[in-house]
From Swiss-Prot:
Domain of life of the native organism: Bacteria
GO biological process terms, semicolon-separated: ribosomal small subunit assembly; translation
Task performed by this protein: Protein S19 forms a complex with S13 that binds strongly to the 16S ribosomal RNA.
Assigned protein family: Belongs to the universal ribosomal protein uS19 family.
Database matches in PROSITE patterns: RIBOSOMAL_S19
Pfam families for the chain: Ribosomal_S19
NCBIfam families with a match to the protein in the record: rpsS_bact
InterPro entries the UniProt entry points to: Ribosomal_uS19, Ribosomal_uS19_bac-type, Ribosomal_uS19_CS, Ribosomal_uS19_SF
Taxonomic lineage of the native organism: Bacteria, Pseudomonadati, Pseudomonadota, Betaproteobacteria, Burkholderiales
Record GO terms (molecular function): rRNA binding; structural constituent of ribosome
GO cellular component: cytoplasm; small ribosomal subunit
Swiss-Prot/TrEMBL keywords: Ribonucleoprotein, Ribosomal protein, RNA-binding, rRNA-binding
Signal peptide: none
Name of the protein described by the UniProt record: Small ribosomal subunit protein uS19
């Protein structure tokens, strides 16, 4: 279910403060965050945000197509190693 338009997008306050500081100082270092639930705002475009996937921080470079999505969508939490191969029986 989508969020109500009258409520607006959700962004953690500490993440927004870090992003505003990075934009003001023109810092190019990744902004480290654990907030996967925060929505990507237009202010984030051009920044690299290191999103935690449960094990490590995955660097995500924000582009204009990402606006409106959640940060957690771009840092996968599960790795798919493939289905087990069939064992061939030698005669």
């Amino acid at each position: 279910m989508t969020r109500s338009l009258k409520k607006g997008p959700f962004v953690d306050h500490h993440l927004l403060a870090k992003v505003e500081k990075a934009v003001a100082t023109k810092d190019k270092k990744p902004v480290k965050t654990w907030s996967r639930r925060s929505m990507v705002l237009p202010e984030f475009i051009g920044l690299t945000i290191a999103v935690h996937n449960g094990k490590q921080h995955v660097p995500v470079y924000v582009t204009d197509q990402m606006v409106g999505h959640k940060l957690g969508e771009f840092a996968l939490t599960r790795t798919f190693k493939g289905h087990p191969a069939d064992k061939k029986v030698k005669k």
